[in-house]
């Protein structure tokens, strides 16, 4: 599969050629059926994602064309956001997209509830979770439109070091 060598280097600006080769090897190991793309099951074999309750959202974001699989180009572009050389804004945008499930540029009350539900499972009653969601929206929603924009999201989490935790070794 010569796919990884035909990628334009500007697309992978957070990785050098050596890292791309290593990622290519890793991708081929994960691609158990040699289809040239990772299914959800193949993607789930990544140790970094196995215990992550948001794995489906990560896959949805990596799967840029929405065909249900992650090809090598999508894999590189997705993982690139977690490079140590990735910038803070890109990492914050990725984190925002985890919550922005319908990709409309806003985190609605319902979206925040769904994502938090993925994280807490049944550890909280839905009424308790809804209270947390409502308080979070009230706190972050500076223009009082009932939803959280990317700028509002950044003003809340941008001062944290979350972007420093969004790193994978290649």
Swiss-Prot record:
CDD domains: EFh (cd00051)
SMART domains named among the record's database cross-references: EFh
Domain of life of the native organism: Eukaryota
Residues given in the record as Ca(2+) 1 binding sites: 31, 33, 35, 42
Keywords annotated in UniProt: Calcium, Metal-binding, Repeat
GO cellular component, as recorded: calcineurin complex; synaptic vesicle
Translocase found in the keyword field: no
Xref: Gene3D superfamilies: EF-hand
Keyword Repeat: yes
UniProt: Ca(2+) 3 binding residues: 100, 102, 104, 106, 111
Residues the entry annotates as binding Ca(2+) 2: 63, 65, 67, 69, 74
InterPro entries the UniProt entry points to: EF-hand-dom_pair, EF_Hand_1_Ca_BS, EF_hand_dom
GO molecular function: calcium ion binding; calcium-dependent protein serine/threonine phosphatase regulator activity; calmodulin binding; phosphatase binding
Domain EF-hand: 18-46, 50-85, 87-122, 128-163
GO BP term (any one): vesicle-mediated transport
Annotated binding of Ca(2+) 4, by residue: 141, 143, 145, 147, 152
Function statement: Calcineurin is a calcium-binding and calmodulin-binding protein found in all cells from yeast to mammals, and a calcium-dependent, calmodulin-stimulated protein phosphatase.
Family: Belongs to the calcineurin regulatory subunit family.
Subunit structure: Composed of two components (A and B), the A component is the catalytic subunit and the B component confers calcium sensitivity.
Family matches, as PANTHER family: PROTEIN PHOSPATASE 3 REGULATORY SUBUNIT B ALPHA ISOFORM TYPE 1 (PTHR45942)
Miscellaneous field: This protein has four functional calcium-binding sites.
Protein name: Calcineurin subunit B type 1
Source species of the chain: Drosophila melanogaster
